[in-house]
Regions:
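Blade-loop segments of beta-propeller domains
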Residues: 1-2, 14
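A flexible loop/linker signature enriched in serine peptidases of the S9 family
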Residues: 10-40, 53-61, 76-86, 99-104, ...
Length: 246
């Protein structure tokens, strides 16, 4: 958060003392994500003390990030019946829905100039895909197996699909120049479990592969000067399920 004295995060703690039940997260060979309707967005100080609750609408409010200029927050909410992107002022006021297409819009980040957003979306198209998406969502689930990278202005205008790779393309993040996007994808993985990092121009050209180890690589973020990036990977974990930062 602005000033580096508080942290923005989502939590289900108002829904009960115990973690929400996840149930079976595999169905028909697909991996599923739970969408807990007890998630809300909070601000806490560096000691963990909650100083403000920003959302209190029924349903899922999570995946919040702050604009570089410190004025806006983008987040995902299903309060209108679908998983859409919303924005709000840094103090939680003026909450506004900015995407309206059927599908799971989430994982959004602002561009360095705070004027655009990059996010991943499932956007089902065929009748079968639409039916499956709606059925899973009614159960508080999504199948993150077919997602592409999109950009739009902070008001939702000028929506553009950046990738057309198939499979799961997600965890996008802008390069500090604002001209490239870093993301994770399994589109070249036969098993679907190996994710590599890629970079692409904001117009969808110039796809470049960044990592090459046949493991899980995701959640990349650039340093402010663009010279370094940090990401999560399960490489070098000795055969365990550990995921570490690199």
């Amino acid at each position: 958060m602005p000033g580096n004295k508080t942290i923005l995060y989502a939590s289900t703690h108002l829904g009960g003392d115990k973690c929400p039940e996840t149930g079976d997260l595999r169905r028909g060979g697909k991996y599923l994500w739970p969408i807990f309707n007890t998630y809300d967005i909070f601000v806490a100080d560096l000691n963990g003390k909650i100083v403000k609750q920003l959302t209190n609408a029924p349903g899922y409010d999570a995946e919040a990030t702050v604009s570089p200029d410190g004025k806006k927050i983008v987040f995902t909410s299903d309060r209108t019946g679908d998983l859409e992107l919303w924005t709000m002022d840094i103090d939680g006021r003026n909450q506004k829905q900015i995407t309206f297409g059927l599908g799971y819009d989430g994982g959004a980040f602002f561009s360095p100039d705070s004027k655009q957003l990059v996010f991943r979306s499932s956007r089902p198209k065929t009748p079968e895909e639409i039916q499956e998406y709606k059925q899973l969502l009614s159960e508080g689930l999504v199948a993150p197996t077919n997602m592409e990278i999109y950009t739009c202005d902070v008001d939702g205008k000028n929506l553009n699909q950046i990738t057309h790779l198939g499979k799961a393309n997600w965890a996008p993040f802008f390069h500090p120049s604002g001209k490239k996007i870093l993301f994770s994808s399994n589109h070249e993985s036969k098993s679907g479990f190996n994710f590599q990092l890629y970079m692409i121009n904001v117009d969808g050209t110039g796809l470049v592969q960044i990592t090459d180890q046949s493991v899980f690589n995701a959640f990349p973020m650039f340093s402010p000067d663009g010279k370094k990036l940090i990401f999560s990977s399960n490489r070098n974990n000795g055969g365990t399920h550990d995921t570490n930062l690199f």
